[in-house]
Amino acid sequence: GGGGGWGWGGGGRGGGGGGGGGWGGGGGGGGGGGGGGGGGLADVSEALAQLRQSPAIAKHKIRFLIATDYREFAAYDIKADDVLECDFTDLYKNYAFFLPLAGYEKSREFSENPADTKAAEKMGRLSDQIRSLNSDSSPEALHALNIFLTRLLFCFFAEDTGIFPPNSFTNALGGITLKNGSDTAAFLAQLFNILNCADHHPARAQAAAHFAAFPYVNGGLFAETYPVPVFDARARRLLLECGKLDWAGINPDIFGSMFQAVIDPVQRSRLGQHYTSVPNIMKAIKPLFLDEFQTAFDQILANSQTRADTKIQKLHALNMRLARIKVFDPACGSGNFLIIAYKELRSLEIRIFQAIKELGRDNIFLSHIHLDQFYGIEIDDFAAETAKLSLWLAEHQMNSAHQLQLGNALPTLPLKDSGHILAANSLRQDWEAFCPRSSRREDEVYIVGNPPFGGSGNRSDAQTEDMETAFAGFKKFKMLDYVACWFWKGAQYIRNSRAKLALVATNSITQGEQVAMLWRPVFALNIHIAFAYQTFPWANNAKHKAAVHVVVIGLAAEPCQESAPDGSQSVFDFGADGGNHELDFSAAKPSPRRLFRPSEQDWVVQEACNISPYLIAGSNLAVESRETPLGKVSPMVYGNKPVDGGHLILSSAEKEALIAAEPQAAKWIKKLLGSDEFLNGKERWCLWLVDLSKDELANLPQTHPQISERIEKVRAARLKSPDKGAQKLAERAHQFRDLHNPESYILVPRVSSERRQYVPMAFLNADVITTDRNQMIPNGTFYEFGILNSLMHNDWMRVVTGRLKSDYNYSGTLVYNTFPWPQASADAQADITELAKNILRARASNSGKTLAELYDPDKMPDNLRQAHQALDAAVDKLYRDKPFSDGLERVEHLFGLYEKLIAAEQHEAENKANAKQGRLKEKA
């Protein structure tokens, strides 16, 4: 066969001889053709399989192998280890498979372990083929298919990890069943039945030897009888290909990504599933409980004054504590958090046993940590079944590690309880009934997980109903993210108890209006934020990675006073040795709370007396929208909303055409700025007919027919609107809804990129109309402009504002009106005014650039950056003489001022109310 990149094998018609010009013939080195016509895809696939064994492939560095009978088509990409199978007539639809021929390599899904990706892709192909052959989509049929796939996954793992004899499942399947797949279902049904039969069950004595050789599995995995789906030749071959993978190299904790690869993408998007990498899982479980257990272990061993037998006693006590805890994931998906938590606890237990052994006690060590300590609720049936399977496999892995390290372990088979995994809607379940506690005061339960996210505009009707159920009794909750439901239910579960919680969430619940809605009622339950990871971009190993920014938040109940039998007050705690300790309540100090802040290299841990709902060091006070500014400054209002159906707005071309047709119209045309036009220098125009007299308006059809036509279209659009306010506006169809047009104003865009250090703002005059995509401060001063352009104000904005995706969504009521303004003398205000003008001068010196370009942090001109830095230093000094180290320190200072200002305002309001009440009493 020739080189050049192609290998060709004939399917039904037989391969050709050796080819030249870059083609390698099936006969000359590809293993020959299929020999005669007919046979369909099974023959083509067989020809391709034979071709892959040819020594000519390596010799000639061939990239693609192809086999076809001109009805069916199969190809193999050697470099990508990828297979294409399709009807010959559909070949053109699959051109992307051959893009490497044009120099475009196909992208590959990232995984830290390539075996995970390959297994996920092959399982996906197998699932697709089975679904195509079995069209029943009833809930019962889908559940049966889900059970079937998890049973296959178990068999693949079992034969590669020592549960079954090596390769026994795949070899039996390949050696006994027919190539056309007609008896594959019957084979699997018989095998699954045997796997559910105990060693002395009569069915084993009657079974064929190749079935009886398989051990009893138990654990419920094969207990129920479900129909096995129909197979054809291709499905059987895909099944065998899956079996030939090395499943020993695949981690059960990657099952989330594998699961994601085989379910419907639309369903995946609807469920909002964001599968979690192991490092991100550890962000939740380490500070939630692992760090405490590891510290206890280290402290026991570190004390050189403690006798060996005392250390052994304390190590046993710690191990017994591990055996008593419960881990509960109320949105467990395919079990990733539970699996990692289980494996980490088992690993710590192994280290405890090794330490006991090294201290001179050579016992027979058997694990006290069992799967029935792990609880999960998952709404998706397949994911729930996968979670059960994954926990069994994780148990087998840890039993093997236990055996390797300590020389003895309980056998994996028969399987034991797979934990408490419930396929149900977590938000409609009673968590207390599902994960019960004998004593809220003593039982350790750790709630952990990554619940689904869903903003107010991205929720299904069912999810909205979930929120109505979860937040029953709340006046406001619809603006909350869907994930907030889990925090609220979790907070109710852990209140007044030893239970703790750590959940991954979209960072929106720590921003904007959501903060007061969610966190005020949570804190009212006497719960605090015990630790938190500030915002970081989400990354996981699943296909089509979800583009979100997340936080990790840990919650715990405040220590509560409880009456002892003698009437004294005490607080309850666990000691380092795992025992229970009563401490004097008055002497108990709150443990420091840990705030994990991102740095260039890693995470920096800051200890704080309290973590605010904005995930900074500070009080629990939530900033709330207000209608007036906290300081004595100019008010901020929305720009002008047109509500015109687009008929009062003109492109540059439309503007020129209108002026050409009706030259007198030029006096009514003004420049129009939304946030995009403002930031990126784009041009739009509008008809601003505010000053039109009644006579001019009446004569428009004769004097300006094009403008009149536009006005009539506005009137029609407003009358058709379901909004009554818009219908009312039809009475003045020639005007925008809002009519703000001051002589001068400061424009503040409502949406700005998170990359910018400063939100770009500008002074504009009455010749420019701003839409409601911007805020405006009519007749704002240069001093106000200077404060707003400082880092002090921008750092405040970054913390308290909401987000549109990850961009800043500037709110006048939530950012501007709540901002604590400094006490500045007239001279200080004059200095800020001059520094603000310097910023405008620096912009003017770079007049060829848009504001988006000027405020790109990578391209900001030096003179503009220096002007801002000079302003920043001056504004900082208005707040205190000592320089601020960073933005967080500024915000912490501002929150302290905000708290004082709000308290003073409330005190003044109370005094006025009391004075009024006093006057009323005097009159009475």
What do these predicted ranges mean?
Residues 2-34:
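Long, low-complexity Q/N-rich tracts
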